[in-house]
Every structure is written in structure tokens, then in C-alpha cells.
Amino acid sequence: MANVVVVGAQWGDEGKGKIVDWLSEQADIVVRFQGGHNAGHTLVINGATYKLALLPSGVLRTGKLSVIGNGVVFDPQAFLDEVSKLQSQGVAISPDNLRVAENVTLILPLHRELDALRESASAATAIGTTRRGIGPAYEDKVGRRAIRLMDLADLDTLPHKIDRLLAHHNALRRGLGLEQIDGKDILRELTAFAPKLLPYAETVWRLLDIKRREGKRMLFEGAQGALLDVDHGTYPYVTSSNTVAAQAATGAGLGPGAIGYVLGLCKAYTTRVGQGPFPTEQDNETGRKIGERGREFGTNTGRPRRCGWFDAVLVRQAVRTCGINGLALTKLDILDGFDTIDVCTGYRLDGKEIDHFPAGEGAQARVEPIYETIEGWKQPTANARSWADLPAQAIKYVRRIEELVGCPIALLSTSPEREDTILVQNPFEA
């Protein structure tokens, strides 16, 4: 019996929410281990649509424990708003089924303001963030000046910690010509949050260690994708945390041995939000067709996603950096009806063929994709629940992806609905 880590194998938006929700039926505990409320999930269950950003997808399953780990950056207001919204849809959420690491870093309004200011300062240097304060909050965490959830339980020492935080931020704001922040305003806001948030606080590493020793099944839910990893992604156009599978251990407070099976998520094509290199992007009618069919708009931001063909080089790289054991391929149905489908099998850089994506920003901008053209299929794959429901050519496409990325397909998703999933290998039983 393996614990399972679910990570994106592209630039995020691969459909992790649905797959995690589908797998969570077999799990006892679902853990978010990095990121913040910048990465949204849309789940369709029995015709009802649920939108999650910060909460683990396990909250939609009764009888499951959901956990927000220490690797997450936590916006108090966004958390309370999301809980309230889901409760209004009939989802039961309380400290009985949701726990938050006491040492999680808090996102404050000053983080959101700084994030937006940086993005607006110059279009030439914009990264394309969601302006939700994720990056600045991680900066304060690394700078050892962050306010953490546990700090709200000690109002005697909280003013000192706020002063330490503002010593940095007010100096920065002076340089930017911004109004100084009064620590009393932050103290007042956090004091009001304390009774609403502290009931969820938990020593998560200890809780998970106890549950692991009891033999409970754990599902670790990543946000974004491996290509947005701050170390292994398309730097600097990345997120501010590690998104690879190894972060599941660090971001939850467990040792690496607690991680068993790594399931990577990828679409049958490729999308990206914001700035950065995208070798297979189709800024043409093909890209628009994929985007319209796939409803490629951000769950949280509504921003249209850039669309292109499947890039086997990048997914193969994610398989290696994440140690992926099996892939869940999503949105195969979006490619129904295409006469031909291109798949990137390699790159050409300065006239030479290469089999990996270079780390240098300049080289990334110069790579040219090498395509293999595959015959499409006319019969629908939407709502298929077994291999027998798939057209032969669609199966050939899936098998070719397996060959190119060097990893088997464990799951296949053919619609946003929870049950429209073809199981090849159960990650919990691998």
C-alpha cells in the first residue's frame, strides 16, 4: 500500500483537481504541500461545479481528513472566503475534517500590494503572477521574518514580530515612494482572524506521522506544475516554490520514505498561463480551437491560457525530475476531430538537435520544436470509461506518448466529470 503524490508534469492546469478528487475516495488523508491560492481547481461532481484554490480537493469527500501543510503560503481572508463559499454549496468543512499546519506562513495585504506593484511596474520584466502575494510571502519566509499561523496564538509577542516584518517592508516602501504601514493595523487585523483560524491549527508533521504509523493512506496534492518549479522550471518565469514531487515530504513535514507512488498529470496537449517560453505554442487558429474546446481560462483569474501541441521533451524532463511512476493523461477528448496532431519529440538549438530543454533563458527562447505528425481520429472520446470506448487511433496516440516520455499511462481522463476516468494502474496498489 503506497502513499501517492500527485504533481503536474507541465505548466499547471493539467486537471489535478479532478484526479485528486477521484483518487481521494481511496485515501484517508489529502494533503496540500506547496503553493497558495494562486492555483485553482475546478471540479464537476454530479453536475455541480466547485472551485477550489487553497483547500485540498479532499474536502469534497465525506469522511476524509484534509490537511494544509507547512509548505503552503496561507491567505487568511482567502481561506475564510473559500470555506464560506463551499459551505454555502453544502460542503461540510470544520476543524474535524480540515487541519492547517501551525507553522504555515501567512499572506498579508502588504504581500498582495507588493506583488501587484512589481507586475505593473514594467511589462518588460513582468513574470505574469496572479498578484496574490505568493512570491513576496515566500520571500519573507526565507528571510526569516514571516508571520506564521502559530503566532496568532501569542498576542504578547506578535507586535514584535510585526515590527520585524515592517522593518523590511517599510524600508522597501520608502524606496518605492509608498505610504508606510502602521503595525497596529496589521495587529488589529490578525487579532480579528485569530479566533476564526486557530481552531484549524495543527502540528501537522506529528499528525501525519501518527497517521502513517497507523497505516492510513495519504494523498499529497501538488499545485501548479513541474515546469513552474523555482529550481527546475523555466526560470525566471516560474512560481516561488518547489513544485516537484520531492517537495511533498518537505512541505508536509515527513521524511522522503513516506512518499510511495508519484503520479504525474499532463494534458493531451500543452497550455501555459502568463509569460515565459513555450516551444510548441500555436498562436493561430489551431491554438484558438484547442483553447475554445478545452475552455482554457484560469479558474481563479479568468485569464486565457496559451495553447499548443503536446511537448514530449518537457514532460519527459518532468518525469525525470519528479521521479514519476505513472501519468494521468487528461483532456484527450479536446483533440477529437483533428485530422492530424503534432507531437514535439525534440528540439533544434542553433542548428543542433537536443533532447532536453536548456536551463538558460536565452537558449530557451531560441529552441525550435521538432514535430512528429500523428493521424487524428473522428469518433468521440468524450465520456469514455474503458479502453473499448476509445477509437483505435486515439489509443495509438496515447501509446506513442508513453513511448516518447518513457512512462506508462496510469489513468486517462475524458471529461471534467469525476467518473469519466479510465483506470490502467491504481497508484495506491502499485
Swiss-Prot record:
Summarize where GTP binds, as residue positions.
Answer: 12-18, 40-42, 305, 331-333, 413-415
* Residues annotated to bind IMP: D13, E14, G15, K16, N38, A39, G40, H41, T130, R144, Q224, T239, R303
Q: Which gene encodes it?
A: purA
SMART domains reported in the protein's UniProt record? Adenylsucc_synt (SM00788)
Q: For this protein, what reaction is catalysed? A: IMP + L-aspartate + GTP = N(6)-(1,2-dicarboxyethyl)-AMP + GDP + phosphate + 2 H(+)
Keyword Ribonucleoprotein listed: no
Residues annotated for substrate binding in this entry: T299, N300, T301, G302, R303, P304, R305
| Protein role | Plays an important role in the de novo pathway of purine nucleotide biosynthesis. Catalyzes the first committed step in the biosynthesis of AMP from IMP.
Q: Identify one Gene Ontology CC term for this UniProt entry.
A: cytoplasm
Q: What is this protein called?
A: Adenylosuccinate synthetase
The protein's location, in the record's own words, is: Cytoplasm
Any one GO MF term held by the record is: adenylosuccinate synthase activity
EC class of the enzyme, as a word: ligase
Key words, A-Z:
Cytoplasm, GTP-binding, Ligase, Magnesium, Metal-binding, Nucleotide-binding, Purine biosynthesis
Record-listed Mg(2+) binding positions: D13, G40
Classification via InterPro entries: Adenylosuccin_syn_GTP-bd, Adenylosuccin_syn_Lys_AS, Adenylosuccinate_synth_dom1, Adenylosuccinate_synth_dom2, Adenylosuccinate_synth_dom3, Adenylosuccinate_synthetase, P-loop_NTPase
Which lineage?
A: Bacteria, Pseudomonadati, Pseudomonadota, Alphaproteobacteria, Hyphomicrobiales
- For bias type Basic and acidic residues, the affected ranges are 285-296
Its assembly, as annotated, is: Homodimer.
